[in-house]
UniProtKB/Swiss-Prot annotation:
Protein's cellular compartments: Cell membrane
Membrane topology: Multi-pass membrane protein
Function: Polymerizes chitin, a structural polymer of the cell wall and septum, by transferring the sugar moiety of UDP-GlcNAc to the non-reducing end of the growing chitin polymer. Plays an important role in cell-wall formation during both hyphal growth and conidiation.
Family: Belongs to the chitin synthase family. Class V subfamily.
Species, as recorded: Aspergillus oryzae (strain ATCC 42149 / RIB 40)
Name of this protein: Chitin synthase A
GO terms under biological process: chitin biosynthetic process; fungal-type cell wall organization
Family matches, as PANTHER family: CHITIN SYNTHASE
Taxonomic path: Eukaryota, Fungi, Dikarya, Ascomycota, Pezizomycotina
Membrane-traversing stretches: 729-749, 765-785, 1027-1047, 1417-1437, 1449-1469, 1477-1497
């Protein structure tokens, strides 16, 4: 007996679907089947062949249609799925549904069929199949997604109630056909390898990933290029590898293959591709070694193993084995994900019911859905199960006495033949194919084990090869299912797919999906599968779908009246009327057809349930132990310890101070500090475990390298906005030019789903068209327009120009008014006499007029007038023939030698003229003035007729020499008289119109023609030159002025130390640790009073940059030495964004940073994002512009004393109370990129320049490269950086209008020096710069690409009377892009932002100057210069080609180029920057890249943005813009606002600036007396934890003369057993010192909390030298208000804020001696020494100490 059943189930469903009645009882033929199938096909219905078999007809087109029942997808039999499920749960019988394909073009129906099962299939299962499909399918000509596995199963485990408890996917033991899918794809078009390889190579791969995996074009891989097909079929309109690749990666991520696992998987796939290049016997040894080297790096294998231990066959076997192992591993991960989701759902359901799920193996059955894509295997399985009576259920029926009529011999022969083709897949071990398979498997195991043991231990490849180290290679054994065993142990249901035609999918008509029908094709499939015989056999005799033991049957149906024993069963069957084969009683079993079984089951379901009797067949389903009730564990209450919050503003609402929003209740989260709980610094765990989290998430350009989260289509609401007239005009213009491109083409072909993206593309297209048109116009005007005005000007030469061509390969001569290039002729031996053609013989004729050397025979060319061959003309010029042997006179009288060709009188016209015409270049021309001049001065008889020049000088000379003999006077007198009377003039009008004159014309043309009049001096030929000359002069003037502006010959000035307070803003994004450390160290080491500079770092989101192993904020905090245990609260603030993205959260850290003896306070703001962002890829990230806006907003509210957000209040508290400087004192903001290093004296120089000129609102210095020799791409940027500063910016600085203050190194004044009016922190600048509606192409380029340049533009717009300067003495260095891809990305941003910003600048009203002497003119010149860069490159290429092809040398163009680069060279030569000579040469070599490649790429990529989905522009019409906005808008109430004074009063904080009657703050004593207190007693309400790095490390005076007793300190960055290296909540409050601690107590990163005893502000002015130490820097706080507030003037940083008396006389003397010992006393001045001393002391001496300094300098000099 078979083991396909266990016992029957007593659990019945409340309903049943009931099967359809079988087909008519008549004989079934192929014709009837064909007709029935066609009818069902046209209606999209399945056809039930028998109770256990269904036929469906599907094509690629119908697989995407909706059926009449509303099902989307291919036609499938849902009832078959329900029947199989009902049988499994009611009969406790394992079932197997076999999905067969009768045609290789039939689409796969596995996923739709799984969805049709009446089971809650977990969604992750379909995701897993989506992840698995690319590994298993490939494009073929007959099927665009053909499965290349033998069998794939989805095995469900069910309870006896029919509920799912498990699901797993598995391949059969036959595995995958890797040879057909990868190793040996057909070498004909239309075939591809497995889809996964093309997904790997698609653009979905990030640049960093492509570089790491060395991914190339598909044609670079030997195994992929066999067919030459690399893209999906064109007949699939939605097929796109890039989109599919994104879905594929998302699916991998969903099933747990992400991070290191996904990188390992991709590395293996890339390695297999490269290993394919090493497969084959014709591979070159060098290519083989290179491929093995690459593969070794990707797979973690020693290349020598692949090269020497593996043969070619071994490498192919290795590819196949690794690929199958990889697929098995993916299936394993998929099954883990499915099991996890199922377990979670079971846990949820058990908790919801209060009862634990308790199932055993005996309580479950299985349904296995097996997909057999190969028609051969499906046919063999089906025919064997139906027609083979020797095994399976057929054999059971025969053994039980059921009459099973044998199949016909023809059918059996077909079955046997079908089985023989696939006997290996069916587990038949007797044939030769089985032995071959076993040999291949053994070989595969041998190779895999040989290579696998050489693989690195921790590599991904070893993980997939050795799934269990103790078991060795288990490929093909573990995780697979045996097809024969599954079929033999289950009740089998067949679902067969028919294809209606043999036509290829590309020939199907998409208009009518069901139109494809070929009776012949369908009939062939029916006959091959013997479906007519199948139906007749099953329907008439053995269509039984249920069978029972007799006792089992009685036990199940006794409630329906079934009697005991076999007789009782037979009687009951007769009573039911089941006598015509509906049920058959065998020897041991009862066999029941589907309709009879359903009838009995339905009656059983309707029968009232009776108390179950004790029966061996009944399960005690209700006897299970009751579940223990579960109680939800309440969440742990928030800590109220010292680290907990005490008074949270967000919870308190407006209890203390009325809310700005009118007392509206805040909707912000009540516990913002819960964000990023855990991990270092409270920023989450990303990057904390470096061993397992070393993957770079972002590269240097901020492009995401990891898996991308899917973009969810959130619900939106629609709003309308007004658009400007200019925008409406521009939109209309764009549509007028692009109307011919339908939107649906952009949507479906261009994959631009959103209207705003399509509109941006149209705008980009129009802009590119206009730019190209303008470039084309420029090129046309310069190159071609002159030729149109003056055609053939380059095809004429005068005598002087001909004489220039005297080279061996540039041999020009003129003969009888025509110019010839005989460079290819003169070297040939063209004389038939003894004269040899040598260089020395020919050189005298280069560039000469050879009229006299080729005299025309008069009798041939003037035959109407000369008949005597002896008549010849003599030359008036005696020097005309200097080499007589070169004269080519022809005729028997002239050449008596009959052997020479010149002997013939016809030589001139027959030989010479045809040959010389081959080298004709153009006409010889003469200026009219020259013709007239020679006629007057040289008595030359020549005239002009019809622009041609004829010369009779030799004619009259010969006539005179021959005494006027009539035979020599052969020309008509009417013509000769004109030459005598009007020499040198135009005689066209006087020319006789006679017959003789007409005859004489031929003679004149051949004998007396001298050329044409030079037309190049005419107005139409000269006007274009003069216009170009005018533009040239204008450009040269601009270049000259720029040169003079840059030519600063003065010595470098050394300004006195400045005392202004400066914020050094450092926005950090994805920079590496080395760059960040270098940048922070450079700011710390600036030669500027450390107390008056603040390093303000803003980390833009939790992002891991390329090459980093931790998020950027954690790297910054690591460098600054912040204690990782610090976890400040996440506080809300308003960011730049759309909708709810405007709400952001940030954390604030503060402290002191020490470097080389300089101790500088810092503030770090980390943008961490909302709670809902934490699962996204870049939580908190809003861009650099948002970082700048954050500090600008903060300083604006400080200036206006306006209400602040919680984050700004915390920043104010940290700066004001912890660091000890009133934020209102800061006057400048130095903006420095995180990877930029600033030279020590740069800040002082910038501040000094601003102090000397109060009109300066912004200033920048020179930026050079740190990595100039790193690669070719950095080398070509060195000179560009240098000259752009010293030429362009220096020139613009003359006008006080530098158009771009680079964000990497510039400084802005915060407010005016006179009246304190806000500048960069003004409302109008912030409002425009913080624009959220960045929804047009122009705004995107301004605000998303060029925010730094646009900020300068806004400053120029709103403060046109202020100056924006460049000073070359301030110097910084930054890292330039080192690869071409990064350079492309950077220049795309720069060039496009430059163009759009210059357009904005050109429209400003108040630019200085007028006409051509205005800044507007310079801006327009720069704009045009940027736009026509490609035209410039094309023109230079044209010049090079023109000169190389023998054209005239463009003297003016060369002079301009020489002038441009010569003047530039003077600049760096004067500055003694000799190295720039080499850099200039490299730059010139790269000019095509800068002037053509980069601009053209940039112009076309103007719309290349990340378009957010929170604000989608749906369209523009009229003066309205329709915008879809997220349903979750930004509510300002989510960010409560409060004034600092109100906040400080409510929290008992010092530093209030108003006249509040503040209560005396509490004092706390301790073991350190009144010098120490708990930090928790002195924090803002947000700093509910101990402030980051704000614990003091010493008592007052803890510098050189500090107290010997030191309290506990914050941990030093490198730990150790140094004193103070333990954590404490106690701090001692001392005055700030910028000197390092004593040895033994020194820490690189000091703490800041120099808090003091609190004093009432009204008494602070009386403190004197013993002033309050309630702040870090000891800055006295005036109690007066600023002009904005209403009392006295704003506190200025010119006051002496040092508090103590400063350095004593001994320190001053020591500094003087040190400085004098280091300087050249012969050249140094007293003023310079004084400046050096003050710089060394880090203090500005005034009063008595200044006088002491002067006296002591004199005394020390006297003593030397």
């Amino acid at each position: 007996m078979s083991n396909r059943y266990s016992v029957y189930s007593s659990h019945s469903a409340a309903f049943s679907t009931g099967g359809r009645a079988p087909q008519a009882g008549g004989q079934v033929s192929t014709t009837t089947l064909l007709n029935a199938l066609h009818a069902h096909y046209t209606t999209g219905q399945p056809y039930q062949l028998d109770a256990g078999t269904s036929l469906v007809v599907n094509t690629l087109l119908t697989a995407t249609q909706s059926s009449p029942e509303g099902h989307t997808g291919p036609t499938i039999d849902h009832e078959l799925a329900v029947r199989a499920w009902e049988h499994a749960r009611r009969r406790a019988e394992d079932g197997c549904i076999v999905l067969c394909s009768a045609h290789h073009s039939a689409p796969s129906i596995l996923e739709p069929f799984l969805a049709a099962l009446p089971l809650s299939t977990p969604s992750i299962a379909f995701t897993a199949l989506a992840a698995l499909r690319p590994f298993l399918t490939a494009v073929t000509t007959f099927n665009p997604s053909y499965s290349l596995y033998s069998a794939l199963s989805a095995c469900y485990n069910l309870t006896l109630k029919g509920d799912i408890t498990g699901l797993s996917l598995a391949l059969s033991t036959s595995g995958i056909n890797v040879r057909k899918g990868f190793l040996d794809i057909p070498s004909e078009p239309g075939y591809r390898a497995f889809d996964v390889f093309y997904y790997l190579l698609t653009s979905a791969s990030t640049p960093a990933e492509r570089e790491f995996l060395d991914l190339r074009d598909a044609s670079s891989y030997a195994l992929l290029r066999k067919s030459g097909t690399y893209t999906p079929p064109s007949y699939l309109p939605t097929a796109d590898d890039a989109a599919a690749a994104e879905d594929f990666r998302s699916a991998l991520k969903a099933i747990g293959i992400k991070g290191a696992s996904q990188r390992g998987l991709l590395s293996v796939l890339a390695g297999l591709l490269k290993l394919g290049n090493a497969a084959g016997f014709l591979v070159d040894q060098e290519d083989l070694e290179e491929a093995c080297e690459d593969v070794g790096g990707l797979l973690g294998i020693d290349p020598e193993v692949l090269l020497h231990k593996c043969s070619t066959d071994d490498r192919e076997v290795l590819i196949s084995g690794i690929y199958e192992a990889l697929v098995d591993w993916v299936i394993g991960k998929a099954n883990e994900a499915i099991a996890s989701q199922l377990q979670a759902s079971l846990d949820d359901s058990s908790r919801g019911s209060g009862q634990a799920a308790q199932w055993t193996d005996d309580d479950t059955v299985s349904i296995t859905v097996v997909d057999l894509p190969r028609p051969a295997l499906g046919k063999a399985v089906a025919m064997r199960g139906i027609f083979d009576d020797t095994l399976g259920i057929n054999a059971e029926m025969k053994d039980d006495g059921v009459v099973v009529p044998p199949a016909g011999p023809a059918v059996l022969n077909d079955m046997t033949a079908a089985i023989a083709q696939v006997e290996v897949d069916l587990g038949i071990t007797t044939g030769p194919t089985w032995r071959e398979r076993e040999y291949e498997l053994d070989k595969k195991h041998e190779v895999l084990e040989k290579v696998g043991l050489e693989v690195e231990m921790d590599s991904f490849l070893r993980q997939i090869l050795f799934t269990a180290e103790s078991e060795g290679i288990t490929l093909g054994k573990k995780g697979r299912f045996d097809l024969a065993t599954t079929l033999g142990s289950s009740r089998v249901w067949h679902h067969i797919s028919i294809h209606p035609t043999d036509d290829l999918p590309e020939n199907l008509s998409p208009g009518v999906p069901t139109a494809a029908w070929s009776a012949g094709a369908v009939s062939r499939q029916l006959r091959e599968w013997r479906l007519a015989e199948w139906a007749n056999r099953r329907l008439k005799q053995i269509d039984f779908t249920a069978d029972f033991d007799i006792e089992e049957f009685i036990g199940r149906y006794f409630r329906l009246g079934c009697g005991e024993g076999k007789d009782g069963v037979e009687n009951w069957l007769v009573e039911r009327g089941w006598i015509n084969g509906d049920a058959v009683v065998g020897h041991q079993r009862i066999w029941v057809r589907e309709n009879a079984w359903w009838e009995a089951e339905t009656m059983l379901d309707l029968k009232p349930e009776e108390p179950p009797a004790a029966s061996p067949f009944m399960y005690g389903g209700g006897m299970l132990d009751p579940g223990v009730p579960h109680y939800a564990v309440p969440p742990i209450a928030e800590s109220t310890s010292l680290l907990g919050s005490r008074d949270n503003l967000l919870n308190r609402q407006s209890t203390l101070v009325p809310s700005v929003a009118g007392g509206a209740k805040s909707i912000a989260p009540s516990a913002p500090h819960t964000l990023h709980t855990g991990g270092d610094y409270g920023l989450g765990t990303k990057g904390d475990d470096k061993k397992y989290d070393s993957h770079p998430y972002y590269d240097d350009e901020g492009r995401y390298l990891g898996e991308l989260d899917p973009e969810y289509a959130d619900p939106k609401h629609i709003e309308k906005k007004e658009i400007t007239l200019g925008r409406r005009i521009w939109t209309g213009f764009v549509w007028a030019l692009t109307f011919w491109i339908p939107s649906f083409v952009l949507r479906f072909v261009g994959r631009m789903k959103r209207p705003d993206v399509r509109m941006a593309w149209r705008e980009k297209l129009v802009l590119v068209f206009l730019i190209l048109l303008f470039n084309a116009i420029v090129c046309f005007y310069i190159i071609a327009f002159g030729n149109l005005l003056c055609p053939n000007k380059d095809k004429v030469w005068n005598e002087k120009e001909v004489s220039y061509h005297q080279g061996n390969n540039d041999f020009y001569v003129s003969i009888h008014g025509k110019v010839y290039d005989i460079s290819k002729f003169w070297k040939i031996q063209h004389s038939d006499t003894s004269i040899e053609t040598t260089t020395s013989n020919m050189e005298p004729f280069m560039g000469e007029n050879l009229d006299a050397y080729f005299p025309p025979p008069l009798t041939r060319l003037c035959g109407d007038f000369v008949t005597d061959e002896s008549i010849t003309l003599r030359n008036n010029d005696t020097n005309a023939v200097l080499y007589s042997n070169a004269k080519h006179s022809c005729g028997p009288l002239q050449q008596t030698d009959p052997n020479t060709a010149l002997h013939k009188i016809t030589w001139y016209e027959d030989v010479f003229l045809p040959k010389i015409d081959e080298y004709y270049k153009g006409s010889l021309v003469w200026k009219r003035s020259e013709v007239s001049k020679q006629a007057d001065s040289s008595s030359r008889y020549w005239v002009i007729k019809d622009e041609s020049i004829y010369d009779l000088t030799d004619y009259f000379y010969t006539l005179k020499q021959m005494n006027n003999i009539d035979s020599y006077n052969f020309l008509p007198s009417s013509i000769t008289e004109l030459f005598k009377n009007y020499p040198g003039t135009d005689v066209t009008d006087k020319w006789p119109n006679s017959e003789n004159a007409t005859k004489a014309q031929t003679c004149l043309d051949y004998v007396f023609y001298k050329g044409k009049v030079d037309f190049r001096d005419s107005a139409r030929c000269q006007v274009n030159n003069y216009i170009l000359l005018a533009f040239t002069c204008l450009i040269c003037a601009v270049i000259l002025v720029k040169f003079l502006a840059a030519l600063q010959l003065g010595s470098k000035r050394r300004p006195a130390p400045q005392d202004k307070f400066v914020i050094c803003l450092v926005p950090a994004y994805t920079e590496g640790e080395d760059s960040l450390r270098k940048g922070l160290d450079s700011l710390t080491a600036l030669q500027y009073d450390n107390k008056r500079k603040l390093i303000y770092v803003i980390c833009d989101g939790m992002i891991v940059g390329g090459g980093n192993d931790r998020p950027t904020p954690k790297i910054v905090l690591d460098i600054l030495g912040v204690d990782p245990k610090i976890d400040p609260p996440a506080l809300p603030f308003k960011s730049i964004g759309q909708g709810s993205d405007q709400l952001n959260y940030g954390k604030v850290y503060s402290g002191l940073y020490e470097y080389e003896g300089n101790v500088v306070p810092y503030i770090v703001v980390v943008k961490v994002g909302k709670e809902s962002e934490q699962s996204k890829s870049k939580p908190g990230n809003r861009g650099k512009r948002d970082s700048q806006i954050q500090i600008m907003n903060f300083l604006n509210r400080v200036h206006h004393r306006a209400p602040m957000s919680p984050l700004e209040l915390e920043i104010f508290h940290q700066i004001n109370n912890v660091i000890g400087v009133d934020p209102e004192l800061y006057e400048y903001c130095l903006m420095v990129d995180a990877d930029t290093s600033v030279r020590e004296d740069s800040l002082n120089r910038l501040v000094a320049a601003c102090a000397n000129d109060a009109r300066i609102a912004g200033i920048c210095g020179e930026t050079s490269l740190q990595n100039e020799e790193r690669s070719w791409w950095t080398m070509i940027q060195v000179y560009e950086y240098y000259i752009s500063h010293h030429l362009s910016k220096a020139f613009e600085s003359l006008f006080g209008s530098v158009t771009c203050l680079p964000g990497c190194f510039c400084m802005y004044r915060l407010r005016t020096a006179d009246k304190g009016r806000p500048l960069i922190i003004s409302d109008k600048v912030i409002k425009e710069y913080a624009d959220n509606d960045v929804d047009t192409l122009h705004k995107k380029n301004l605000l998303s690409l060029g925010e730094d340049r646009y900020l300068t533009t806004l400053m120029t717009k709103h403060f046109p009377t202020m100056s924006y300067k460049f000073i070359p003495d301030a110097y910084a260095s930054t890292a330039a892009p080192e690869t071409f891809s990064v350079l492309l990305s950077q220049r795309r941003r720069w060039i496009n932002s430059t163009v759009h910003n210059l357009v904005e600048l050109a429209a400003l009203k108040d630019l200085c100057g007028f006409c051509c002497f205005s800044m507007r003119f310079v801006v327009l010149v720069d704009l045009l210069g940027t736009i026509i860069l490609p035209a410039t490159c094309v023109y230079l290429g044209y010049l090079i080609y023109s000169v190389a092809s023998g054209g005239p040398i463009p003297i003016i163009s060369i002079a301009i180029l020489a002038g441009v680069y010569g003047l530039q060279a003077i600049i760096f030569i004067v500055k003694r920057q000799w190295q720039h000579i080499g850099w200039m040469i490299i730059y010139i070599c790269a000019y095509p890249i800068y002037s053509f490649v980069l601009p053209m790429y940039s112009f076309w990529k103007q719309d290349d943005f990340s378009w957010g989905n929170t604000r989608v522009v749906l369209g523009e019409k009229g003066n309205k813009r329709v915008v879809a906005v997220e349903d979750e808008p930004f509510d300002p109430r989510s960010i409560p606002l409060q004034r600092w004074d109100d906040y400080a009063l409510a929290n008992n904080l010092p530093g209030r600036r108003g006249d509040y009657n503040m209560s005396q703050e509490k004092f706390y004593g301790g073991q350190y007396g009144d010098m120490g207190m708990e930090m928790d007693d002195m924090h803002s309400q947000y700093s509910s934890v101990k402030p980051a790095s704000t614990i003091l490390t010493g008592f007052p005076g803890a510098g050189r003369n500090g107290s010997p007793y030191m309290p506990p300190q914050s941990p030093a960055p490198f730990g150790g057993n140094t004193p103070g290296n333990r954590h404490s909540h106690l701090s001692s409050f001392s005055r700030y010192t910028d000197m390092p601690l004593q040895p033994g107590h020194q820490s690189r990163n000091l703490s800041v909390g120099n808090l003091s005893q609190f004093q009432d502000p009204s008494n602070r002015h009386s403190v004197g030298l013993m002033q309050s130490t309630d702040n870090l820097l000891g800055v006295p706080r005036p109690n007066s208000r600023s002009p904005v507030g209403g009392y006295t003037s704003r506190p200025q940083s010119a006051f002496d804020f040092r508090g103590s008396g400063g350095p004593d006389e001994m320190a001053i003397t020591d500094a003087i001696r040190s400085c004098l010992a280091e300087v050249d006393l012969d050249t140094v001045t007293k003023k310079q020494v004084r400046a050096l001393v003050e710089q060394r002391l880090q203090a500005t001496l005034t009063g008595d100490k200044r006088a002491f300094l002067d006296r002591q300098i004199d005394q020390e000099l006297a003593n030397m």
